[in-house]
Amino acid sequence: MAVERTFSMIKPEGVRRGLVGAILARLEQKGYRIVALKMLRLTPEMAAAHYAEHRDKPFYQDLINHITSGPVVAMVLEGPGVIAGLRRLMGATNPQEAAPGTIRGDFALETSDNVIHGADSPASAEREIALYFTPAELG
């Protein structure tokens, strides 16, 4: 299986609830290497760029308001099959449907506060990594 890179973000409620360490531990225990990591607070412009594909959806403004409500932890992960593997480890978007043992199944409280984001495709991973990290930050 090819080594890939993907983008992931611990959302504001994950930071607020003190889950950063537990989530990072799960990612590393899975064998994923953290290539780059930073804590930041998204501006509305950064959030709009991140959620550009949802711009015309009725929930768009709620996404923007939520993701800018507090600091996030943005990261780049690397490993064989990391894009699909991270999606499995995160669990279903709706925490009520997420299996126990997944990050959302164990930590998320509701769909709007589902603790973690992960790129859903190689193209999304590339786009999102470029939004948050410079080539120099990626080593």
From Swiss-Prot:
The keyword Cell inner membrane does not apply. Pfam families: NDK (PF00334). GO terms for cellular component: cytoplasm. Keywords: ATP-binding, Cytoplasm, Kinase, Magnesium, Metal-binding, Nucleotide metabolism, Nucleotide-binding, Phosphoprotein, Transferase. It catalyses: a 2'-deoxyribonucleoside 5'-diphosphate + ATP = a 2'-deoxyribonucleoside 5'-triphosphate + ADP; a ribonucleoside 5'-diphosphate + ATP = a ribonucleoside 5'-triphosphate + ADP. InterPro entries: NDK-like_dom, NDK-like_dom_sf, Nucleoside_diP_kinase. One of its GO terms (molecular function) is nucleoside diphosphate kinase activity. CDD domains: NDPk_I. It comes from the Bacteria. It is found in: Cytoplasm. Its cofactor is Mg(2+). ATP binds at K11, F59, R87, T93, R104, N114. The active site is at H117. GO terms for biological process: CTP biosynthetic process; GTP biosynthetic process; UTP biosynthetic process. The keyword Cell division does not apply. Homotetramer. Belongs to the NDK family. Major role in the synthesis of nucleoside triphosphates other than ATP. The ATP gamma phosphate is transferred to the NDP beta phosphate via a ping-pong mechanism, using a phosphorylated active-site intermediate. HAMAP family: NDP_kinase. This is Nucleoside diphosphate kinase. It comes from Moorella thermoacetica (strain ATCC 39073 / JCM 9320).
